[in-house]
């Protein structure tokens, strides 16, 4: 076992090991330090001393394990990066993992200070100047030396406002549609559009392989500090970073082996044993054979009163707000899928060590939360199950989702994501609003299609007025009205939960009182006086006069307007009359369900006859 693995094992037992005046010290909770562990520490004392001396970091073993590594050799990708790299090889023209943001800058922009700030950001964060070429058949991280930022500056001052808007839209769309070359070009790119001496648009484009949500907060927070300093002629106020993302990637590869890996894997294998890895949500459209990423977005808000009641319920249950929302969401998805045993994913920052908190890079991981609603428990009981599941998952969050999928050896299905098709999160990423000294900054909406990386991805944020939810869905699977309905049902479900936790899962309502009244009363109010002086085909003729171009009948991919249906029925009626059909004449109609069946019924009535339906499945002798 490598020394780094042994120290990580000690850390998992909450045994602290540190170096003080070249002497090895350790501290353990009562009853944890066995004679075997004490003997192992003694046996490996020289190795541990050498490692701690090299690390040059104090006390906590969680802080010891990530140390700077040599840049003279090829550096591996982290596990999360490796999966994105692999997906890019499968679909090199895909832009599903591209970020594009547009910031409108109003005021006296100091171009030199902005250029210095971006240059310094790229210098201090190696990941922003990293590419991913192939070496000996494997991808590696290649870090370019620091240099002045390369950016495109477009002067649009000579154009009208309408022309500037059109040019911005054109450039944004072109940037969004252009895939990255992970091996050969910078994976963070900037374009500055000058609209007037005091108005600019900054376009930022990045690939997900070098950033996550936490990284964006770092990026904009540090950009603000650097710009403020450089506009005043001051040096950078930011301390140098002791380690970089590449050091984390090397550490992760070394640490996640042996006993550490076995413990993580054994937990997840046991946790997911017997689970069907496919969530069968009913879709509005057939699932394409190969996964697509066309998306749509619907937004919802939970008001302050409901949010406060959810927080109170969480506190009373010794749970977090996320655990409560996740439990409710699992109930919702169970009701919509008909599955009692299901899994929903949730992203986590995966920055468990303070040493990686200030780093940009792709650290985020996905946890698979399993919910079992068998036996129709009360929400209180299910809530406790989810609380326990969540806590144990957090204790085993270091296993990369990519490795979990690989080790589970799931059947590959190109039509959907492996294991997790639906994501749910309550975001708590540190928020650093875009802010540059002396400027008014506004995030600009982009004229781009939404990209959906999952069937459904639900994110909530705390806002002053409660909780704001953004539901991103695959529009090749779902219609917007369906997502709106599901989102409204989630709110109704939450209201029922805070009113009575003891209700059984199956009894929790999804429909609001207004929806229940509409469904049970209004839509069932079908009693109507039938006009006794008109036949069916005559009533149909009146509808043709009122709405000739409206769709009258549809079957599978075919449809007929009222006018088209009337013309076909008239043609058939004339033919039937020529054959002697008239009043009191019975006409058999033997046809499968189709548009032609409706034409036949109307044609017979228009000819004056009466139709006799004959089942095509009847024996031939009976039909004769």
Feature locations, PLM:
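Membrane-interface amphipathic/re-entrant loop segments adjacent to transmembrane helices
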Residues: 285-294, 376
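His-Asp-centered acyl/peptidyl-transfer active-site segments
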Residues: 71, 91-98, 115, 126-127, ...
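RNase H-like polynucleotidyl transferase catalytic core
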Residues: 274, 281, 344-350, 614
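Carrier-protein-dependent adenylate-forming modules in NRPS/ANL systems
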Residues: 1-244, 265, 270, 283, ...
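DNA breakage-rejoining catalytic core of tyrosine-based enzymes
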Residues: 294-307
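Short, solvent-exposed loop/turn elements at beta->coil junctions and helix N-caps
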Residues: 137-139, 191-193, 282-289, 348-350, ...
């Amino acid at each position: 076992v490598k020394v780094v693995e042994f120290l990580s094992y000690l850390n998992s037992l909450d045994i602290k090991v540190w170096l003080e005046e070249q002497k090895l010290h350790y501290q353990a909770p009562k009853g944890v330090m066995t004679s075997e562990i004490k003997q192992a520490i003694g046996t490996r004392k020289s190795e541990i001393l050498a490692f701690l001396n090299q690390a040059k970091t104090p006390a906590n073993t969680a802080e010891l394990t990530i140390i700077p590594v040599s840049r003279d050799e090829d550096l591996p990708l982290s596990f999360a990066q490796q999966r994105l790299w692999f997906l890019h090889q499968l679909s090199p023209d895909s832009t599903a993992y591209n970020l594009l943001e547009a910031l409108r800058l109003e005021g006296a922009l100091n171009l030199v200070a902005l250029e210095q700030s971006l240059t310094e950001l790229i210098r201090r964060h190696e990941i922003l100047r990293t590419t991913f070429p192939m070496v000996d058949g494997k991808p590696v991280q290649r870090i370019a030396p620091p240099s002045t930022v390369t950016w495109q500056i477009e002067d649009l001052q000579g154009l009208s406002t309408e022309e500037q808007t059109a040019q911005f839209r054109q450039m944004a769309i072109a940037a969004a549609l252009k895939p990255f070359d992970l091996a050969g070009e910078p994976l963070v790119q900037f374009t500055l559009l000058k609209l007037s001496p005091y108005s600019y648009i900054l376009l930022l484009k990045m690939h997900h392989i070098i950033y996550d949500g936490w990284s964006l907060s770092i990026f904009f927070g540090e950009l603000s500090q650097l710009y403020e300093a450089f506009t005043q002629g001051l040096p950078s106020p930011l301390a140098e970073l002791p380690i970089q993302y590449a050091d984390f990637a090397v550490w992760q590869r070394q640490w996640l082996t042996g006993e550490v890996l076995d413990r993580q894997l054994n937990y997840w294998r046991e946790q997911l044993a017997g689970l069907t890895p496919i969530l069968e949500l009913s879709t509005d459209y057939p699932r394409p054979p190969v996964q697509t990423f066309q998306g749509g977005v619907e937004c919802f808000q939970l008001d302050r009163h409901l949010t406060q009641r959810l927080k109170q319920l969480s506190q009373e249950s010794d749970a977090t707000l996320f655990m409560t929302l996740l439990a409710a969401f699992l109930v919702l998805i169970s009701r919509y899928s008909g599955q009692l045993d299901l899994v929903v994913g949730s992203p986590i920052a995966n920055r468990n060590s303070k040493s990686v908190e200030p780093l940009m890079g792709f650290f985020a991981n996905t946890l698979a939360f399993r919910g079992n609603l068998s036996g129709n428990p009360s929400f209180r009981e299910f809530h406790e199950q989810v609380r326990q599941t969540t806590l144990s998952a957090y204790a085993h969050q270091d296993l990369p989702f990519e490795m979990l999928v690989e080790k589970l050896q799931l059947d590959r299905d190109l039509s959907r994501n492996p294991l997790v098709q639906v994501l749910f999160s309550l975001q708590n990423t540190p928020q650093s609003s875009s802010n540059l000294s002396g400027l008014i900054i506004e995030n600009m909406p982009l004229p781009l299609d939404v990209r959906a990386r999952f069937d459904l991805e639900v994110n909530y944020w705390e806002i002053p007025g409660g909780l704001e939810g953004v539901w991103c869905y695959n529009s090749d699977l779902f219609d917007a009205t369906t997502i709106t309905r599901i989102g409204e049902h989630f709110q109704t479900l939450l209201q029922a939960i805070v009113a009575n936790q003891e209700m059984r899962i199956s009894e929790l309502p999804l429909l609001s009182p207004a929806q229940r009244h509409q469904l049970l009363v209004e839509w069932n109010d079908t009693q109507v006086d039938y006009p006794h002086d008109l036949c069916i085909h005559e009533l149909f003729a009146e509808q043709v006069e009122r709405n000739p171009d409206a769709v009258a009948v549809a079957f599978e991919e075919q449809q007929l307007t009222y006018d088209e249906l009337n013309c076909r029925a008239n043609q058939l009626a004339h033919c039937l009359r020529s054959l002697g059909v008239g009043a009191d004449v019975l006409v058999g109609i033997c046809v499968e369900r189709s548009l032609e069946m409706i034409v036949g019924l109307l044609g017979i009535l228009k000819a004056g006859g009466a139709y006799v339906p004959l089942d095509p499945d009847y024996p031939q002798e009976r039909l004769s």
